[in-house]
């Protein structure tokens, strides 16, 4: 497992994304949990947090220290390493800053404890997406592990997810966004309108998708369905036959040389696009911004099939107790 401790960079990268609860923001440093500032001042507390580089930013730790007097030690990993650490090293952290799709892997192991919503001051400000799966009343609920499907437990000691909101939340939601294809409009030479465009022979050897298996296979599913190769009942809960077809598709596309590379980190995606080695790839919106900041044309391209969405939040270690838990 590869980890890197964050150095001071200020707010950047995917911190440009939407906050999941309007005033809630981060659980620490924003008043989400309240009523204990005097205790904290008398008993200095250090909390260990790990998660992806998306949101483990030194500026957040600095704000937490300034507002609450709590020292927040942050360690950044990639998504796969975050899931592995959450399960296999539960004594190494107090706060797990992870994505919702990881919860199905993590919660059954008992390493994260349910969170009493009555202790969350701004719980009523959490956007509906994390409570019922809809941004607006007429929104269509997404396929896959939508945050609300793993957002609650029936009780404080339950090991299964609740179908409706309860008093016990799995995590405080913090950020969410929807990803699509990033393109070099100066190099693609035509309009890009569908996920299927990434398989255009004209782009052979100049495309890329994400090399995090649980997310990259969703890229492949969006592409395959857009091409008319398959119609998934639920892309986030594939049958064995659907998985086999999707993997076979990826293997053939790679063997045919369609992909220049598979990227795993923010910087990799930026470098591939900025260098011109890749002209169309699955991409995060702040990575597009990073390419533009270099004076290079890059576009976060809307597609007719829609976006691949995601969300993340803060979970509490089952080992947290007493003042540290508060």
For each of these PLM feature ranges, what is it?
Residues 283, 287, 292-326:
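Extracytoplasmic/periplasmic substrate-recognition and gating elements
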Residues 93-98, 262, 279-284:
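Paired acidic/hydrophobic, glycine-rich loop segments that form the ligand-binding mouth/hinge
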Residues 86-87, 271-276, 316:
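Hydrophobic residues within well-ordered alpha-helices
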Residues 72-78, 97, 257-265, 301:
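Short beta-strand-to-loop elements that line the ligand-binding cleft
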Residues 55, 107, 112-268:
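Extracytoplasmic ligand-binding site segments that recognize negatively charged/polar headgroups
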Residues 42-109, 270:
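Early extracytoplasmic/lumenal segment of secretory-pathway proteins
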Residues 1-15, 38:
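N-terminal secretory signal peptides
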Residues 12-32:
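N-terminal export leaders
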């Amino acid at each position: 497992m590869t980890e890197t401790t964050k150095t001071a960079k200020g707010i950047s990268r995917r911190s440009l994304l939407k906050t999941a609860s309007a005033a809630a923001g981060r659980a620490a440093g924003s008043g989400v949990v309240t009523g204990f500032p005097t205790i904290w001042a008398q008993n200095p507390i250090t909390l260990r947090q790990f998660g992806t580089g998306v949101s483990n930013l030194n500026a957040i730790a600095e704000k937490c220290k300034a507002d609450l007097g709590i020292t927040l030690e942050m360690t950044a990993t990639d998504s796969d390493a975050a899931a592995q650490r959450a399960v296999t090293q539960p004594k190494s952290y107090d706060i797990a800053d992870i994505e919702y799709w990881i919860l199905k892997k993590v919660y059954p192991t008992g390493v994260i404890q349910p969170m009493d919503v009555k202790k969350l001051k701004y719980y009523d400000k959490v956007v509906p997406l994390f409570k019922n799966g809809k941004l607006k009343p007429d929104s269509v609920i997404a396929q896959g592990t939508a945050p609300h499907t793993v957002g609650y437990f029936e009780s404080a000691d339950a090991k299964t997810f609740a179908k409706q909101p309860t008093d016990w939340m799995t995590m405080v939601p913090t950020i969410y966004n929807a990803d699509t294809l990033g393109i070099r409009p100066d190099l693609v030479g035509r309009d890009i309108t569908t996920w299927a465009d990434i398989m255009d022979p004209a782009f052979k050897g100049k495309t890329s998708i994400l090399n995090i298996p649980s997310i990259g296979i969703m890229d492949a599913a969006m592409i395959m369905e857009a091409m008319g190769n398959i119609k998934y009942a639920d892309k986030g809960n594939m049958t064995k036959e659907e998985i086999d077809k999707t993997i076979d598709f990826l293997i053939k596309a790679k063997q045919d040389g369609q992909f220049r590379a598979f990227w795993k980190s923010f910087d990799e995606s930026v470098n591939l696009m900025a260098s011109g080695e890749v002209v169309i790839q699955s991409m995060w919106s702040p990575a597009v911004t990073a390419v533009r900041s270099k004076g290079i044309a890059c576009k976060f391209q809307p597609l007719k099939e829609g976006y691949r969405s995601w969300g993340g939040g803060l979970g509490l270690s089952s080992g947290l107790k007493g003042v540290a838990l508060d």
